[in-house]
Amino acid sequence: MFANAPRGRDISPMSFAPVLDDLPLKKSATVREFERRIAPASDAQLEAMAKHSRALTLQNFGRTMRLFAPLYLSNECINNCRYCGFSRDNPILRVTLELDQVIAEARHLAAQGFRQVLLVAGEHPKFVSGTYLSDCVRALAEDFSSISIEVGPMETEEYVPVVAAGAEALVVYQETYDRQIYAEMHTSGPKRDFNWRLDCPVRGYEAGFRRIGIGALFGLARWQDEAVALAEHIEYLLKRCWQAQISVSLPRLRPAAGSFQPAFTMSDRELAQLICALRITFPQVGIVLSTRERASLRDALVSLGVTMMSAGSHTEPGGYTRQGTENLHHTVRGRIVAPEFDGGADQLATGQFEISDDRAPAEIANLLRGRGLEPVWKDWEQALLAS
């Protein structure tokens, strides 16, 4: 199923691609066991899995929950992705924050307690260059103990100065591991190259990132197939990038500009089962839960195996402090076009997708304490690298 689609550029000898293309016929023993854990289960079986998952999470991570916030730098993008609000041909309000505006957004997050931030941007080298990204990281490094980036895939040597500036984690989602569906979803732009994206985590590891985050966007393909491929990818990275901490995110599609309708669904029960299956199969891998999910579901899932949560999120550049409103525009074939409204004071850039859990970070922290979990705003000190 995964092999019958375009390959893109040449595959490196150490690529995950050959392993992926052997699915579903060839699976490791670990992944076969994982596949059994995501098969339809009775209530009693699922409760037993949940109990096991909770115990393993407590054993490996303690009674803690890392909290982070995404900081969107730009919603410019040269890719056309059918499901994404930032897709190039969507007539949305766009902006790329200037450095002082990025700092203002970051200081707002720091004032709320965050010391872990994820810098996010659409893929557009004209607006989000490696130099711009390094400058943003360097400007925030003093106030944030952990800076992660989620941007378009880059070459190893392009990541090196970003790491040197202070970034310690790279996040890149394959979106879907089904090559055919991937080709259908990504109609133009460099993101069409499946293998280039697939091997991005390894390039980041070779550049010096100490944390690597991957994931699939559930709703593009059958969730069980995505989960098996994701498990194979986790197992591969645990061996190939053995000095890095590996984490996995399990986002489900949310409404966004363009009004894409997912062809596949994943129920709350199935999401809970997947979290438990991942925790039992990979006890030391981090599991991330975003504000895509509604508050009541996030509250129910925090004790199952999740180790990291976003809180109080905005998915539009400048969303926390209304930065960049004076520079809002449309982008048409690389050209900046003025919007039709007068001024930008009452407008914000368009977000990537709709948020479901809009509770304030302090409210999330109090909820966690009520569940016997300690919210962790900071769990890493860059100075340790120099000691």
Q: For the regions a protein language model found, what residue spans apply to each?
A:
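Conserved, mostly hydrophobic/aromatic
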Residues: 53, 81, 119, 172, ...
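Short, charged low-complexity linear segments at domain edges
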Residues: 45-66
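Catalytic cores of alpha/beta
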Residues: 155-164, 210, 221-236, 294-304
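Generic structural signal for well-ordered alpha-helices
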Residues: 69, 106, 133-137, 159, ...
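Core AdoMet radical
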Residues: 88-105, 109-205, 210-220, 242-249
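Auxiliary Fe-S-binding modules of radical SAM enzymes
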Residues: 1-44, 239-387
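Canonical Radical SAM [4Fe-4S] cluster-binding loop centered on the CxxxCxxC motif
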Residues: 59-101
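Short, small-residue-enriched loops and turns at beta-alpha junctions
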Residues: 75, 123-128, 218-223, 256-257, ...
